[in-house]
Amino acid sequence: MKKVFAAALILTVMAGVCFADGVKHGQCWTVSELTELDKQDVAGGKGTLHGEFAFIRDNARDEDAIKEIGFMTLNHGAFIGLHRHSDNEDAYLILSGTGIFTDGEDNAYVVRPGDMTIARPGQWHGLANLSSEELVFLDIIAKNGAADLEAFKSNPTPQYFPADKLFDKNTEHAGGTGEGTLYGKFAFRREQATADQAIKEIGLMTLKPGDSIGLHKHDANEDTYIILAGTGTFTDGDGNEYIVGPQSVTIAVAGESHALKNTGTEDLVFIDLIAQNHAAKD
């Protein structure tokens, strides 16, 4: 993990309360509450994939759209083998270092901080670190239980979104009652998503000091804010407030409220990923 994170990392213990099977998770995890878990030779790859997780897919509920969120590290020479998921979607969002991402068409791309990748159901992907620095990335797994999996085969979608090709879309008074401007750079947005896709939107967002996203909820979508830089205050559906900083993970499932305010003196930068499981029942 990057040195900037190292001083803040605390090794936590895997407890049943944290990863209880089928139990609804909370809405906010600070860096000290992430759980460390290493995997070896993932998908036929090589070396250790080090992970620090808010929650893992093995304990997700059927109705959850976002099944897993983790900060992952590959050291020099380590790689995740080329593989595919039958019904999950898997996004790798590069935070630091340089790697090689391989897509389902056997294209290989050099990936750097700010680049975003995704594999929809049935699409192949792999990731390798051939540089001397650690390759650090977010790994977010989601599932739409009502997806027509055959539709993905007949209509493959792009998998690689370089940082310099992300498109801008800014929002005033985000969440309806927010203050200032929410600046966004997007790989894709929910307006163009299909009913089969679980991950509807991925954006790199910025709130200037004092600006905010107002308290709001999504009727059907799940929305995660994953903090990369700066300091802010996250408000959950019960009105609880949390101080969040780098490597804090927040989420609001369908029907839950959430809000975010930049309470620091520097830009608050975060990933905003929206997903939906159309099979979920109210």
Mark where each language-model region is.
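Positively charged n-region of N-terminal signal peptides that target proteins for export
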Residues: 1-4
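Conserved short histidine dyad/triad with adjacent acidic residue
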Residues: 55-57, 70-85, 188-190, 203-218
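Short acidic-glycine-tyrosine-enriched beta hairpin
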Residues: 106-121, 239-254
